[in-house]
Swiss-Prot record:
The protein, known as: DNA-directed RNA polymerase subunit omega
Subunit relationships: The RNAP catalytic core consists of 2 alpha, 1 beta, 1 beta' and 1 omega subunit. When a sigma factor is associated with the core the holoenzyme is formed, which can initiate transcription.
Catalytic reactions of this protein: RNA(n) + a ribonucleoside 5'-triphosphate = RNA(n+1) + diphosphate
Role summary: Promotes RNA polymerase assembly. Latches the N- and C-terminal regions of the beta' subunit thereby facilitating its interaction with the beta and alpha subunits.
MF (Gene Ontology): DNA binding; DNA-directed RNA polymerase activity
Coiled coil: none
Transferase recorded as keyword: yes
Assigned EC number: 2.7.7.6
Amino acid sequence: MARITTEDCSKVIPDRFQLVIYATRYAKLLNYKVETNQSKKEKRDKPPVIALRRIASGKVSVAQLEQDFINSLRTRSRIEPIVEQDESEDLEEKFEYLPEVYIGEDYSDLDDQIFTEETGEDFEDK
């Protein structure tokens, strides 16, 4: 059994990097898709070998492989649209778990403490 090499495929796809990308993509497609028209020789080979053989023989359209690869890179269908919400609804939802506490303006418990504005420390401690 002769091994398939990249030199065999270089006549169809001259760039080796593109060859690897297209052959990988086609091999994944072969792996997921069950084909009934495979020959006995292809049935015992692995999908990457089958992909390289078909590319070298010209059985696979390089333009179709390129288009499939480009479509796989598009993210438009994967991005979810942004739905704008009212900000006041968001604030109400965030604080629903807090208990209701009355806060008055009585600061009588702070009368005996003097704070500095710059450091926030007590004068009495110094």
